[in-house]
Amino acid sequence: MNVQERRNLNAAVERHTSDHVSWYLSSIGRIPLLTAEEEVELSRKVQLMMALLENPDAESNSENQAVLQAGQRAKTKMLKANLRLVVSVAKKYQNQGLELLDLIQEGSLGLERAVEKFDPALGYKFSTYAYWWIRQSMTRAIDNHARTIRLPIHVSEKISRIKKMTRELTHQLKRLPSRAEIAEALKLPLQDVEMLLSQSTPCTSLDAQARGDDGRSFLGDLIPDPKSLEPMDAMDRHIQHEQISTWLAHLTEREQQVLQLRFGLHDGEQHTLAEIGRRLNVSRERIRQVEARALQKLRVLSQQPLCPEAC
């Protein structure tokens, strides 16, 4: 396949996607917009429906069934009449990881949520309220399913070209192409292709489920906490704690008390010399002297074997 044929194929793929979007826009463009009075009337019917659906004790009689049916018809009418708003918002978030049709689909979910929660008594237009829900749904989708870090538009366009060429070469070669082959086909330096591909790697949420038998493990659970101790480290800490306790036993009661407060040996809370002095009703200088004498004794003890009984 020569360069011109590749360009023709890429153009055909782009036209195919564009045709789908154009058809969709043409379809929703024929749906009439709602007046302010219609919005209020339909929203009230939806509210009545939602109140029944959220009430588990509601009776399933003919009157309630009529309310549910009227509410569903009103909801559908509001959704269809506001799809143009979804498309308008979606266009603002193109080239950030999701295709336009995917953004429209995600935005439609936000629109549905807005229809269900809108209260016309608040006094503002439905489109103002729905815009927030639509935008939130799209941005969450971009973060969760596309990228956490948004790329500049020109970088996203280059990555799209690489992905298209990868599909084309895979079909042509009956295998996955190498990065060098992709770079040659696109007439780009290999290092540029490698850099762009590294940037296109999607970020995975730590809340994503990890494969397992119980289905309840998440990726975040498998990442070690740098603040937690490994078993051997914990054992070392335990031995050190016991050794310090042995050394402290060689000190006077006052010396032990001062070091325990000074270094937080019991509760982890360290105190200043002045604080210890006030607690023990002596001067700050006196506490400093006791601390210095106690530390000197510990230096002597620390030079002895760790387990003199076993040596």
From Swiss-Prot:
Sequence motif Interaction with polymerase core subunit RpoC, residues: 102-105
Family assignment from sequence similarity: Belongs to the sigma-70 factor family.
Coiled coil: none
Organism superkingdom: Bacteria
Location of this chain's protein in the cell: Cytoplasm
Gene3D superfamilies per record: RNA Polymerase Primary Sigma Factor (1.10.601.10), Winged helix-like DNA-binding domain superfamily/Winged helix DNA-binding domain (1.10.10.10)
Residue span of region Sigma-70 factor domain-3: 157-234
Keywords: Cytoplasm, DNA-binding, Sigma factor, Transcription, Transcription regulation
Record region (Sigma-70 factor domain-4): 247-304
Protein name, UniProt field: RNA polymerase sigma factor SigA4
Species this chain originates from: Synechococcus elongatus (strain ATCC 33912 / PCC 7942 / FACHB-805) (Anacystis nidulans R2)
GO molecular function, one term: DNA binding
Pfam families reported for this sequence: Sigma70_r1_2 (PF00140), Sigma70_r2 (PF04542), Sigma70_r3 (PF04539), Sigma70_r4 (PF04545)
Functional description taken from the UniProt entry: Sigma factors are initiation factors that promote the attachment of RNA polymerase to specific initiation sites and are then released.
Annotated GO biological process: DNA-templated transcription initiation
Keyword Mitochondrion in record: no
Record region (Sigma-70 factor domain-2): 78-148
Transport keyword on record: no
GO terms for cellular component: cytoplasm
DNA-binding region: 273-292
